[in-house]
Amino acid sequence: MGCKNLLSLGQQMLRRKVVDCSREESRLSRCLNTYDLVALGVGSTLGAGVYVLAGAVARENAGPAIVISFLIAALASVLAGLCYGEFGARVPKTGSAYLYSYVTVGELWAFITGWNLILSYIIGTSSVARAWSATFDELIGKPIGEFSRQHMALNAPGVLAQTPDIFAVIIIIILTGLLTLGVKESAMVNKIFTCINVLVLCFIMVSGFVKGSIENWQLTENKSSPLCGNNDTNVKYGEGGFMPFGFSGVLSGAATCFYAFVGFDCIATTGEEVKNPQKAIPVGIVASLLICFIAYFGVSAALTLMMPYFCLDTDSPLPGAFKYRGWEEAKYAVAVGSLCALSTSPLGSMFPMPRVIYAMAEDGLLFKFLAKINDRTKTPIIATVTSGAIAAVMAFLFELKDLVDLMSIGTLLAYSLVAACVLVLRYQPEQPNLVYQMARTTDELDQVDQNEMVSASESQTGFLPAAEKFSLKTILSPKNMEPSKFSGLIVNISAGLLAVLIITVCIVAVLGREALAEGTLWAVFVMTGSVLLCMLVTGIIWRQPESKTKLSFKVPFVPVLPVLSIFVNIYLMMQLDQGTWVRFAVWMLIAFAIYFGYGVWHSEEASLAAGQAKTPDSNLDQCK
């Protein structure tokens, strides 16, 4: 009996979501277009990083070669963005990576993904709100910070912030109120701030190229101190030239620059609020990443042309660079752009946060009252207010520098799961899920052969076991031209094995870096064997028949691109320190307590599995 109950629980955790086939039906308001999505993605991604991150990475890691660091980071982000784009075309519903995981790899993984997305958005909102407050305080002479230190100091070093940030709380309250008014209104404000930000960045790039000098990309160490006007012995000069810290410095800078592109995934949460989601979401993701890369590339190039990389101020590099060139008045233009960027960033974090909460509550995995929709504004008002309140409390009490890495680990985990979902789903047979049917036209749905549809109850508990026998021939040379249950099972097993192998490669590459450099036998053997097995398993997946489902957008070069995306994301996760992993473990313990205490028993999919599900025939009729 115990084994039977354990098996039943396992099936519950792996059940997959069957989504309503209706294309248009949504409780949310469909009012966003492609331009709105591009503005949302650019506003979320092109935030404080462009005004601060470029200086820190150029000075400490890459020098003028920071432009290559941003290029590598952009390519890594595009890999994840392409995977999000395909799922946006397949499943244009609210929920982003959470929903993508739910319809592909099962309920437990979906809950983990959604829970970490919520964490990322909350921390992103709180940290940028504090940055906005600090920037504004700096601009007016720091009276707010001085008042807080004198009258509101918190005596809990290492636990709470030195002073509470009331202004950050006010910012979050204003943005929360703006989001409760409606999607169209908040999107309009976002577009205005984003346009101002882009114009300021264009001004910075043009000014930098005009006032800059190519000599700053060709410096040697003996030219350093006179150029900076100081004799600081702590300044790192490297070897000079365009790539002063070598290619390893460029890669190290790319790992940091990757986080500058985090934010585009908020586009994928708008599936039920976009007029034409199958086309608008992929275009919005790719276009926003392209615009952000051009901005990061141009600003970092202008910055290192205007001023020697080793002289850059890591906190406020752009005002320092203009001052170095004798144009101190330009700092006001930089301040305007910085405040606009810091205004769109929390809006970009707060916009998807309640929508992920709403999607999880609608599915019964979080408390049901969080799924309430305001009748007038058609927004998830309870989820918006709740998430805003949590973000405000964190911004008020905590120094968030220790939580930034925690935000990154949650985002990278979501990216990895989405890439894995694309890899798995591309090789699965047709199922009655919206995963396939939402991407089709009504005429195409009329032609679906009902005999090819498997039952909804079977599909909920995972991919079905195969009737064929495993053999080298059936694995490497499948008979069918279309995906079957057997080929789908092979891909599932291969994807799981591939994840283990990639994790092994990343652990050895990061933790065994010195052993690899010294040629230690065990490190070389494990690394070589794991890489070869990764190539073999990827080849096995490539040999399986691929789904011919027509979509408005598909990731090219599958399975190679999703595998590369998973590798990059896991490698960056392994770069995070031990404290981050401990905090991540605590966050996950809270997640498991909620899921096993509430979610697994109140899941809507559990109700369907218990007998309330519609028959495959009725699901098909609904699509016609």
Swiss-Prot record:
* Cytoplasmic topological domain residue ranges: 1-35, 83-102, 184-191, 263-282, 354-379, 425-487, 547-554, 601-624
Write out the catalysed reaction: L-arginine(in) = L-arginine(out); L-lysine(in) = L-lysine(out); L-ornithine(in) = L-ornithine(out); L-homoarginine(in) = L-homoarginine(out)
- GO MF annotations for this entry? amino acid transmembrane transporter activity; basic amino acid transmembrane transporter activity; L-arginine transmembrane transporter activity; L-histidine transmembrane transporter activity; L-lysine transmembrane transporter activity; L-ornithine transmembrane transporter activity; virus receptor activity
The UniProt entry, under InterPro entries, shows: AA/rel_permease1 (IPR002293), Cat_AA_permease (IPR004755), CAT_C (IPR029485)
Which residue ranges are assigned to the Extracellular compartment in the record's topology? 58-61, 124-162, 213-241, 303-332, 401-403, 509-521, 576-579
Location relative to the cell? Cell membrane
Q: Which domain of life is it from?
A: Eukaryota
Q: What's a GO cellular component annotated to this UniProt protein?
A: plasma membrane
Q: Cross-referenced Pfam families, in alphabetical order?
A: AA_permease_2 (PF13520), AA_permease_C (PF13906)
Where, by residue number, does the polypeptide cross the bilayer? 36-57, 62-82, 103-123, 163-183, 192-212, 242-262, 283-302, 333-353, 380-400, 404-424, 488-508, 522-546, 555-575, 580-600
Give the bilayer topology.
Answer: Multi-pass membrane protein
At which residues is glycosylation annotated? 222, 231
| Modification Phosphoserine occurs at | 618
List, in alphabetical order, the GO biological process terms annotated in this UniProt record. Answer: amino acid import across plasma membrane; basic amino acid transport; L-amino acid transport; L-arginine import across plasma membrane; L-arginine transmembrane transport; L-histidine import across plasma membrane; L-ornithine transmembrane transport; lysine transport
Q: Which UniProt keywords apply?
A: Amino-acid transport, Cell membrane, Glycoprotein, Membrane, Phosphoprotein, Receptor, Transmembrane, Transmembrane helix, Transport
Instruction: State how it assembles.
Output: Interacts with TM4SF5; the interaction is negatively regulated by arginine. Forms tissue-specific complexes with ASL, ASS1 and nitric oxide synthase NOS1 or NOS3; the complex regulates cell-autonomous L-arginine synthesis and citrulline recycling while channeling extracellular L-arginine to nitric oxide synthesis pathway.
Q: Which NCBIfam families match?
A: 2A0303
- Cited function: High-affinity, low capacity permease involved in the transport of the cationic amino acids (arginine, lysine and ornithine) in non-hepatic tissues. (Microbial infection) Acts as a receptor for the ecotropic murine retroviral leukemia virus.
Protein family according to the UniProt entry: Belongs to the amino acid-polyamine-organocation (APC) superfamily. Cationic amino acid transporter (CAT) (TC 2.A.3.3) family.
Q: Spell out the PANTHER family in the cross-references.
A: HIGH AFFINITY CATIONIC AMINO ACID TRANSPORTER 1, INNER MEMBRANE TRANSPORTER YGJI-RELATED
Q: What is this protein called?
A: High affinity cationic amino acid transporter 1
Q: Per the UniProt entry, what species is this protein from, by scientific name? A: Rattus norvegicus (Rat)
